[in-house]
């Protein structure tokens, strides 16, 4: 039998799980203090729903579940690979939320401010910062079309990061509608814009040359590709310059409002920036998009945007929706590398007792010590020195004994 976890998935030791529990607890505390409510959805979703979710390249990373019994036999006999699966593991929390809202809309407030902290799955090539099973911490607002929803999500998400000691980050903001207008003005056809945006979003992974090569492979107009390459090469581009290519000035006004308001709320604690190349890879985004980046990590540690058409796929009527997701694994990884310590955590000690000890008295003493310490009761070993060394190596701060009043701190 193999003892290692599957590639891209991890076993967590107690110390790391304790830190993760604390970080997730602080994030949830911030979300709940802002009036958001937590829900839960199944890990498995209908395969047809997943296929129609406009998830961009994530649709190629779905863990699919084979049909069972006679249905599998019939699917195999059909010769069509698409018939083999009827369900799959969720790749993010947006599609499940949209389905959940459509199913429960009559029981939910409007606007609906919701929390999801749960596991998602992608058939990634495992590497640092990219796992096949990972946790996302999402907040979403459904039923509010105003830019105040974007501002609130940015405010709450950044406060959550600040509350766990995360600093030095930048909130990057763009609007897909402005970007689409710019791309159309460069010569890309309207029906190719989603594909162009998905490629453009890979800029930080494959670079400008990679973007150009991928667009060329898609057989898009050479003149449009060169125009986009020139735009990328130009470096810093102002919002006014890009917005001039957009047909609706109100879109640019909303983006300016969000940038200005978010910057005022930041109050110098983090940066807020317009990022003309920000796209986000998921195809379901319809308006503003945002990401949080930091110097300690090459990719985004949080991201989100507006997805006004997703719920409508289930209901047949459009419901405005916008969400922001913290990349929990990446944030935890950065904090661990920085040697993060849980503020105000009680020291962990062991209460050692002899084999003839009255166990009622042992547990009573442990209860008294827990006013000051986190206490684990353990039988005392024959070689006390060796046992104390093992406890220290395991992260214990000290030990207490039944026949002594003081605590031995290592």
Model-derived features: where do they sit?
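Charged, compositionally biased N-terminal leader segments and the immediate start
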Residues: 1-4, 183, 188, 195
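Positively charged, Gly/Ser-enriched RNA/tRNA-binding surfaces
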Residues: 19-36, 45-46, 81-84, 92-106, ...
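Acidic, His- and aromatic-enriched active-site or binding-groove loops in soluble protein domains
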Residues: 58-74, 187-211
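Short, structured secondary-structure boundary patches
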Residues: 51-66, 190-194, 295, 396-402
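Glycine-rich, mobile lid/loop segments that gate access to catalytic sites or pores
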Residues: 170-181
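Short Asp/Glu-rich motifs
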Residues: 50-51, 180, 202, 387
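Short glycine/threonine-rich loop-to-helix capping motif typified by GTGT followed
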Residues: 54, 180-190, 283-290, 337
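TRNA-binding/sensing appendages of the translation machinery
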Residues: 1-91, 95, 103, 151, ...
């Amino acid at each position: 039998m193999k003892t290692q976890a599957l590639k891209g998935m991890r076993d967590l030791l107690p110390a790391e799980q304790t830190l993760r529990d604390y970080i997730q607890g602080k994030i949830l505390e911030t979300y709940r203090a802002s009036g958001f409510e937590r829900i839960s959805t199944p890990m498995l979703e209908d395969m047809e729903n997943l296929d129609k979710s406009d998830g961009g390249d994530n649709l190629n990373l779905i863990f699919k579940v084979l049909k069972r019994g006679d249905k599998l036999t019939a699917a195999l006999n059909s010769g069509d690979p698409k018939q083999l699966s009827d369900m799959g593991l969720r790749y993010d929390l947006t599609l499940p939320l949209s389905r959940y809202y459509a199913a429960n809309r009559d029981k939910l407030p409007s606007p609906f401010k919701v929390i999801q902290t749960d596991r998602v799955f992608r058939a990634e090539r495992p590497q640092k910062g990219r796992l096949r099973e990972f946790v996302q911490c999402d907040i979403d607002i459904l039923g509010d079309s105003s830019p105040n929803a974007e501002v609130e999500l940015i405010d709450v998400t950044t406060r959550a990061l600040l509350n766990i000691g995360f600093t030095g980050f930048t909130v990057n903001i763009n609007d897909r509608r402005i970007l689409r207008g710019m791309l159309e003005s460069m010569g890309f056809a309207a029906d190719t814009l989603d594909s162009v945006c998905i490629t453009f979003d890979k800029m930080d992974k494959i670079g400008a040359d990679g973007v150009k090569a991928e667009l060329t492979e898609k057989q898009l107009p050479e003149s449009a590709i060169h125009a986009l390459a020139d735009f990328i090469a130009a470096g810093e581009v102002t919002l006014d310059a890009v917005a001039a290519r957009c047909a609706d000035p109100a879109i640019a006004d909303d983006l300016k409002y969000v940038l200005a308001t978010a910057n005022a709320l930041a109050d110098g604690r983090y940066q807020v920036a317009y990022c003309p190349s920000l796209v986000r890879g998921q195809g379901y985004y319809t308006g503003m998009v945002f990401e949080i980046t930091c110097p300690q990590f090459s990719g985004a540690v949080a991201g989100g945007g507006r997805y006004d058409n997703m719920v409508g796929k289930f209901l047949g009527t459009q419901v405005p929706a916008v969400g922001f997701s913290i990349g929990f694994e990446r944030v935890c990884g950065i904090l661990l590398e920085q040697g993060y310590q849980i503020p105000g955590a009680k020291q962990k000690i062991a209460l050692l007792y002899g084999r003839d000890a009255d166990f009622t008295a042992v547990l009573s003493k442990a209860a008294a010590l827990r006013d000051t310490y986190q206490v684990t009761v353990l039988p005392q070993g024959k070689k006390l020195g060796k046992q104390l060394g093992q406890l220290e190596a395991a992260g214990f701060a000290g030990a207490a004994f039944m026949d002594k009043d003081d605590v031995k701190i290592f």
